[in-house]
Amino acid sequence: MDRNSQKKHHLLPVFLILLCAVFFIPAHTSAAPRINLEKYKKGDDYLVLAYNTRYGKTTYVRSQPSSKSAKLAKLKHSDALVVDQSRITAGVRTSWIPVYLPSKNVTGYVSTSIMRLKAISYASFRKGASPYAYDAICYGLKYLGTPYQSGGNDLKKGICCSALVTKCFRKAGRSMPETYVINQYNECKFISRRDLKPGDLIFYRSNTLPPYGGLVHVAIYIGNGFILNATGHTGSTYPNGGVCIKALSYGSHLASRAIYGRLL
């Protein structure tokens, strides 16, 4: 073997290592950020939410603050969970957020990698779109975790979107029409997105499913960019579906066709 051949022979392993680095190592690898959750330990006067901010990305609720622990639930884009403030330790930076799963009656942990946190004060519900907003929203929040059922009317066994809205506002003392989305739509005056207040209704349209003039879903706005609804579009059980909280951008194909209404 001549000298040039020997040099090429020695360079081959180096070339292969570099090739692997280029093609097989992810371009963006970073650990989940460690954050101080203390500012979100706000007490019973606030609803603190952790929500998935990434389109097309999922993450898991784990049984322990470790990626090796059991998976309790999958979180899709816009899914929001109530933070278990009792599990927040003051002064400690962590990459795991404690969240409550009412459907399982347990606290789990979700990585900070694609999650964000926001707080909503219960007092803001009293400044909502109507005198009924506070009681309607608080009543609905009691049933987080109830599964979705098309045409369902039971707050414990299974319920649909329009039945949830009707039950919440009737409980708050407002007369409501029969539980059809189109009837609730006809009870509203229409407002812009920037004018939304807690207690307003959001109607979603679809070009592929045309019942009730294209209306396929209704939700209650609870403030700070979130809705309370009973949904089956991305799953029928909590936290993807059923009675759950979503970011307003939920279901981008639906959110782009939303209509905002205020009960008259």
Task: List PLM regions with ranges.
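Boundary regions of SH3-family modules and the immediately adjacent low-complexity/disordered segments
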Residues: 32-42, 100-134
